[in-house]
Regions:
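Short aromatic-enriched loop/helix-cap "lid" or pocket-rim segments at secondary-structure transitions
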Residues: 37-41, 94-95, 154-157, 188, ...
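A short catalytic or substrate-binding loop motif that flags glycine-/basic-rich loops and adjacent residues
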Residues: 1, 75, 198-201
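Conserved Class I S-adenosyl-L-methionine
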Residues: 153-180
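Short amphipathic alpha-helical segments and helix-helix/interface helices
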Residues: 10, 14-16, 70-74, 129, ...
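Conserved SAM-binding loop
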Residues: 24-28, 65-152
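Class I SAM-dependent methyltransferase Rossmann-like catalytic core
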Residues: 1-23, 32-42
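Core SAM-dependent methyltransferase catalytic element
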Residues: 186-226
Length: 226
């Protein structure tokens, strides 16, 4: 699911104009775009109404926000979408189990890889992270979010070093790394924040660009590698 804070991160990529024309984009899991009408109007003006899903196929009444058509929105940005999952929710997904080694035709294929909350549900999370990195071309971007302090949400909670070490060891430059607690909260990462303040229901969000083609290696946590 893509919520306001996820879509703001994704939209940073559009604003930076770092995607080629006809960009290849992959979503890890079905991306229901459930965002506020206010945000869509802010980003798209009168076009926002064209993106709305009138007959909502999923009961998202428990979520704040409206459902917008992710295909129409990304087509507006000249993106070709691939959606992978282990369940065919809509019938258009390609089956891919991120717990397993990546299939050859997914390697270095995508300009943008979007994970808005899938990796923490993969039991073999290290392999899933590796697969995410291996999917993106050099010059491409990963946008990923995972729980920082949400017990019982998935199998795992992440820490900032998951991204600084995982991406930093494997040829990526981190463009943004933040913690969100709600749609209205944006906290820049700092040692004091993470050592002294534990945000309830905190979510880590990272944008990383692949700047070098490197064979993936398992990182060693930096505080132990010195």
């Amino acid at each position: 699911m893509i919520l306001d804070f996820n879509f703001k991160l994704i939209h940073q990529i559009f604003d930076l104009n770092c995607l080629p024309e006809s960009a290849e984009v992959i979503f890890l899991g079905w991306p229901d775009l459930v965002v506020s009408e206010q945000l869509m109007i802010e980003l798209y003006g009168d076009l926002a109404e064209q993106f709305r899903v009138e007959n909502n196929p999923v009961p998202w009444a428990r979520k704040d926000g409206e459902l917008f058509d992710v295909h129409t929105v990304f087509q507006h940005h000249n993106c070709n979408l691939t959606i992978i999952d282990v369940i065919k929710h809509r019938g258009v997904e390609e089956f891919l189990d991120l717990n397993e080694p990546l299939l050859e035709h997914f390697y270095k294929r995508f300009d943008l890889v979007v994970d808005t909350g899938t990796l923490e549900h993969c039991f073999n999370v290290g392999t899933a992270f590796k697969n995410m990195c291996d999917m993106v071309k050099v010059g491409g971007v990963v946008v990923t979010s995972a729980p920082y302090s949400r017990p019982y949400h998935g199998y795992y909670n992440f820490v900032q070093e998951t991204y600084t070490d995982g991406f930093g060891t494997n040829g990526f430059e981190i463009l943004d790394l933040i913690c969100t607690k709600s749609k209205k909260m944006r906290v820049v990462l700092a040692e004091e924040f993470f050592t002294k303040i534990m945000p309830g229901q905190g979510i880590l969000n990272c944008i990383a660009k692949k700047v070098e083609d490197k064979k993936f290696t398992w990182p060693i946590q930096r505080k132990y590698s010195k």
